[in-house]
Regions:
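A broad, structural surface signal
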Residues: 38-42, 46, 115-123, 267, ...
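Short, flexible, glycine/charge-rich loop motifs used to bind or transfer phosphoryl groups or to couple energy/partner
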Residues: 55-56, 111, 286
Length: 321
């Protein structure tokens, strides 16, 4: 289904007195975007089959609509840039349900790919961005999560994102010493664990197994399969305003101020990185460089599963946050 708007492309690009006098300003960008999308929905309304269920949870709203605009994207955060939003300016209906949540994507310029579509659609399911809007601080997750640096073909979002925002998997907490096995992230069960920090009320750790196999995980950073360890701040949703971040992936050389090497973030006997604690590189530091108190050892070889040993050292230091 397609629709051609009454205005030229320049109408939906930023105003410039010399080069684009008909462009939008901060005061009218929303109404221009929403009017265009309203007109598009109304134009194709009669072509949508009446038997098509557009409201799977029966809340009165269309579950989601994706608009694909011809051409390449403009600059980041401009109107013609891939994004997820809400069509709140009008009451627009499809098959008796209100069109509200939508994704806007561009058809060319390198941004129209499965990775971008998945990234934007996970926004519609509640997932936040894991990159920094202002570009400040070290990259927190990078190519380990589709909500930071999406690939084409896309990689998965991390286990914590699946658990918290998708409600697709459980993330059981480890409280006892022992040997623990992990299945690869593509499995629904036994693919992650949560470990609380003894030194923080709001920060904790998540471990997961990233195995380079199948369609989606072969494009993860680096050359190895193995265990990924990252820090979660339970008081924050996403990384857009970070740092501090909700999700931070540990990697050699990574600190509060330095990026380190995300390509080497994998732990395994194959990489030679088989433990993480407050003395290793990377260490299990909390935000603000407080020691995290994590102690994982004897991380094994990646196979059908990967195993690790958890030692709870119960060393209490200054409480962070």
């Amino acid at each position: 289904l397609s629709y051609q708007d009454q205005y030229p492309r320049s109408y939906y690009q930023p105003y410039n007195a010399q080069t684009n006098p008909e462009g939008y300003t901060e005061g009218n960008s929303t109404i221009r975007e929403h009017t265009m999308l309203k007109n598009a929905v109304e134009f194709i309304y009669d072509e949508v089959p009446l038997e098509l269920d557009v409201d799977g949870n029966d809340d009165g709203y269309v579950d989601n609509v994706t608009f694909l605009v011809s051409g390449s994207p403009d600059g980041w955060s401009d109107l013609l840039w891939p994004h997820r939003w809400s069509l709140f300016s009008f009451n627009v209906f499809l098959n008796g349900s209100i069109v509200d949540s939508y994704n806007l994507n561009l058809a060319s310029g390198g941004y129209f790919n499965v990775g971008t579509l998945c990234h934007e659609f996970f926004h519609s399911l509640g997932g936040p961005d894991l990159y920094h809007y202002a570009g400040s601080g070290p990259t927190a997750a990078g190519g380990w999560d589709i909500m930071d640096g999406s690939s084409n073909t896309p990689q998965y979002m991390g286990a914590w994102m699946k658990h918290k925002y998708g409600n697709w998997i459980d993330c059981p907490e480890i409280t006892q010493l022992g040997i623990y096995p992990l299945l690869p992230l593509q499995y629904q069960e036994s693919s992650c664990f949560r470990i609380n920090s003894p030194n923080s009320n709001n920060e904790f750790f998540v471990v997961e197994y990233r195995k380079k196999e199948g369609i989606y995980e072969v494009n993860t950073p680096g050359n190895y399969s193995g265990m990924l360890v990252y820090r979660i701040n339970g008081n924050i949703n996403g990384n857009a305003d970070g740092p501090p971040d909700e999700v931070y992936v540990y990697r050699p050389g990574g600190t509060t101020y330095n990026n380190g090497n995300l390509n080497d973030a994998i732990f395994s006997a194959e990489t030679g990185r088989t433990e993480i604690n407050d003395s290793t590189d990377p260490s299990s530091f909390l935000y603000g460089d407080f020691p995290g108190g994590l102690n994982i050892q004897e991380i094994g070889f990646p196979g059908d599963i990967i195993e690790f040993v958890y030692w709870n050292i119960f060393v209490q230091t200054t409480i962070s946050g």
